[in-house]
Amino acid sequence: MKNNTTEDLSLIKLPKPVFSHCSTVLEALKMRRTYRAISNKKIPLQILSDILWAAQGVNRVHGPFGGPGRTAGSASNSQEISVYVAKEEGTYLYEPDSHTMTPVAAGDNRSLAIGPGQRTSGANAPVRFIYVVDVDKFKTAGYQEPGLYDLEVQKSYYFVDTGLIAQNVYLATSALGLVSWFHNCNKTKLAKILRLKPHQRALFGQTIGYADE
């Protein structure tokens, strides 16, 4: 890994998502699979844009409680999960409202976006997503249900909300001719590399790419 400053990285403005792909939801479900043998073939920026939008992009300006609505639901529209994108040159934070990728750490951190005992699978994949929760966002959610302040309830919510995003990624990659794999990550090292705050924590990773067949 290189020094994790971001001086050599720039904000990436993603192209608008393309909605003309021919696969239906049922076809994507039929093709959905967890696949670990992923090649190093680069993912075009348009395809990455489409997958990120599917993950948790803005699909309506006025969602629950007045804020923008996203493709993946969340508890009381808390939107407490963020998607980080680990690529060879650096790691970026996906910003749904502007549909951009903001650099947060330079260098190749893809090996940290997977559990220590899983590194040989999909090791050459061009992209790994990292799912990070910010539990403070529960306190500012639109609907202040008492459960949002209960730590165990919070945990159940953010695990489910992460799963909703990950399933969107599974369906998008299936529809676009790619494969993906949802897995663990190196939570301790990612917290340092991504400069996470005490109320943030890395939860899971998801490897994205083309099947190595």
Predicted stretch roles:
Residues 10-11, 19, 153-155, 204, ...:
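A short, structure-level motif marking secondary-structure boundaries and short turns
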Residues 194-213:
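A glycine-rich helix N-cap at a beta->alpha junction
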Residues 75, 181-182, 198:
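Short, surface-exposed helix-loop/turn micro-motifs enriched in polar/charged residues
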Residues 2-127:
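N-terminal amphipathic, basic helical "cap/leader" segment at the start of enzyme domains
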Residues 1-2, 197:
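Secreted/extracellular ectodomain signature
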Residues 32, 51, 83, 125-140, ...:
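Small-aliphatic-rich amphipathic alpha-helix that forms the alpha element of a beta-alpha
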Residues 144-146:
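Flexible internal linker/loop segments at domain or repeat junctions
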